[in-house]
Regions:
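A short, structured loop/turn motif at beta-sheet edges
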Residues: 77-84, 111-117
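A short hydrophobic beta-strand element
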Residues: 82-91, 105
Length: 129
C-alpha cells in the first residue's frame, strides 16, 4: 500500500466534505476531474462533467433546508501500475437545519493523481437507508 497516496486521498476527501458542509463551490471544483462522473444512489441519475456537478451542487446549496452529505472512507486501494486509486466507504446525508439523518449508504470513488494532486474521476452511490 502507498501510505502517502492513501493519506493524500483521505485529506482530499476531508476537504471535499468540508466544502460540501460550507457550500463552497470554489473548493469543490479542484477536487473533481474535468470529466468526472457521479451516479446517484437512489435513481442512478448520471451527472457527467465537473461543470454539471458544480451546477447540481449550486442548486442543492440554494435549498433553505438542504441535505449535507459526508463521505467516510473505509478503505483505499492504490494501484501500483497506474496513478489511480479506488476508495470505498459509507456516506450519509443530514438535514442542514436539524441534523436529522435523511439518507445513508455506501459508495465507491475512483481517484487519479494529476499535476494538481488527486482528483475524483468517478463516484457511485448506493442508498441503503
Amino acid at each position: 500500500m502507498d501510505a502517502s497516496a492513501d493519506l493524500a486521498i483521505r485529506l482530499r476527501r476531508a476537504a471535499f466534505n468540508r466544502a460540501l458542509a460550507e457550500a463552497d463551490l470554489a473548493a469543490i471544483g479542484p477536487v473533481l476531474a474535468p470529466n468526472v462522473v457521479l451516479v446517484t444512489g437512489t435513481d442512478s441519475a448520471v451527472i457527467a462533467g465537473r461543470k454539471a456537478q458544480l451546477q447540481a451542487w449550486k442548486q442543492e446549496f440554494r435549498a433553505p433546508s438542504r441535505i449535507v452529505y459526508v463521505r467516510v472512507p473505509n478503505a483505499i486501494t492504490v494501484s501500483a501500475a497506474e496513478p489511480i486509486a479506488l476508495e470505498h466507504g459509507n456516506w450519509r446525508g443530514t438535514s442542514s437545519t436539524s441534523e436529522d439523518l435523511i439518507a445513508s449508504g455506501e459508495y465507491s470513488a475512483k481517484w487519479r493523481r494529476t499535476g494538481e494532486g488527486w482528483v475524483i474521476e468517478a463516484e457511485i452511490f448506493l442508498t441503503l437507508a
